[in-house]
């Protein structure tokens, strides 16, 4: 039954479960993923780094740590937060394309680019720079860890602003609905290229 008492009870149960299992979202470097990283917590994502899943998982973990964490928990999380971004930036380049996801067995960037057109293939959502800014803020303004990959972050943002932005509205868009996890519906199946909004 949906009532205030049950809501309170189930919220407490959910929070306790999350507090107990939060470090199950942490992953060590493996294969193509050279840095520690975060996953949403499901076994389906064992060694997969996804664009906005890592960002939103990080925000959730930060909230969990604010509510129930220690200074050691905060310090430990930093490597995983940074690693999400650094793993993605390691797949960047001058054209600005960065993949939506990286698996432990993802080929090297040059191999991926032989199979796709980076100008017509979806890439990481525009939240990559936002995620980096979030981590910089959480670490007291330290951005030195971004130095090596910063060019790739700049070209990534530039690609969205120059090639994936609707001129009339200024809204950023995806090239298509591939890997956006939008259910296949009449609204997506016949959508024109370059018209899906992130």
Across the structure, where does each feature detected by a protein language model lie?
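Catalytic cores of carbohydrate-active enzymes
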Residues: 2-12, 28-30, 95, 99, ...
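Extended, well-ordered alpha-helical scaffold segments
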Residues: 6-17, 70-89, 142-161
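Alpha-helical support elements that line or immediately flank enzyme active sites
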Residues: 47, 51-95
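Well-ordered alpha-helical scaffold segments within catalytic/enzyme domains
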Residues: 1-3, 56-76, 127-143
């Amino acid at each position: 039954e949906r009532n205030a008492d049950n809501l309170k009870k189930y919220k407490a149960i959910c929070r306790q479960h999350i507090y107990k299992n939060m470090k199950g979202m942490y992953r060590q470097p493996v294969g193509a993923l050279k840095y520690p990283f975060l996953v949403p917590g499901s076994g389906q994502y064992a060694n997969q780094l996804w664009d906005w899943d890592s960002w939103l998982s990080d925000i959730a973990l930060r909230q969990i740590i604010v509510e129930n964490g220690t200074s050691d928990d905060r310090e430990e999380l930093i490597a995983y937060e940074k690693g999400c971004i650094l793993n993605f930036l390691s797949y960047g380049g001058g054209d600005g394309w960065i993949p939506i996801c990286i698996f432990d067995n993802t080929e090297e960037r040059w191999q991926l680019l032989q199979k796709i057109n980076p100008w017509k293939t979806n890439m990481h959502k525009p939240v990559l720079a936002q995620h980096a800014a979030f981590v910089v803020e959480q670490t007291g303004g330290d951005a030195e860890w971004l130095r090596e990959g910063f060019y790739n972050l700049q070209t990534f943002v530039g690609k969205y602003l120059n090639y994936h932005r609707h001129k009339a509205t200024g809204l950023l868009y995806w090239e298509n609905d591939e890997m956006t996890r939008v259910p296949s519906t009449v609204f997506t199946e016949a959508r024109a290229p370059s018209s899906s909004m992130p």
